Amino acid sequence: MINEFDTIAAIATAVSNAGIGIIRISGSEAMEILAKIFEPYNKKVDVYQLENHRLYYGNIKDGEEVVDECIVLIMKGPHSYTKEDVVEIDCHGGVTVVYKVLNLVLKNGARAAEPGEFTKRAFLNGRIDLSQAEAVMDLIDSKNEMARKNSMTQLKGGLSDRIKQLREEIIYQIAFIESALDDPEHYSFCLLYTSPSP
């Protein structure tokens, strides 16, 4: 059964032979999991004390075996996409390496993320609204420049801002109608002074 409070992990890049592969971890145990598998190049550095929004070079290890050299990025909540603690492990992009690192992360306490679960958490934690969550998928699926631009406008809140504006206008109109029903004479007076000039 899926628990929305589990620490989750997934491969964030296309799985292919490439220069870099990224494994993303999000949740309250992200740093604890990292501490079990990451050895910073500077051995004096405590993994739990790594600074927010900084890159750290080191090795991913499975016990004493070095699996890969990597760069780790720390994004502590609420200053991350999901508003949770997030760790990104940038390793070499070979298929075998990426899956080995992901399996180490899963073995040490994370659960494999469902498709779209990072964006779902961003929505549930108030980082983005529903319109912006839909825009993320539209951006990923965009096939041309116009679709990309429209998705970015929506992701930046363009549609959300317009919806908020329309909501405020509707609330104002409802209040005006309720006022007219409560006091018809006042309504007639208001119409006289708010009607457009001929």
Please annotate each region the language model reported.
Residues 1-149, 153, 157:
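A glycine-rich (often HGG/GG-containing) alpha/beta subdomain
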Residues 150-173, 181-182, 186-192:
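An accessory alpha-helical subdomain
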Residues 193-198:
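Conserved small/polar residues in nucleotide/adenosyl-binding loops
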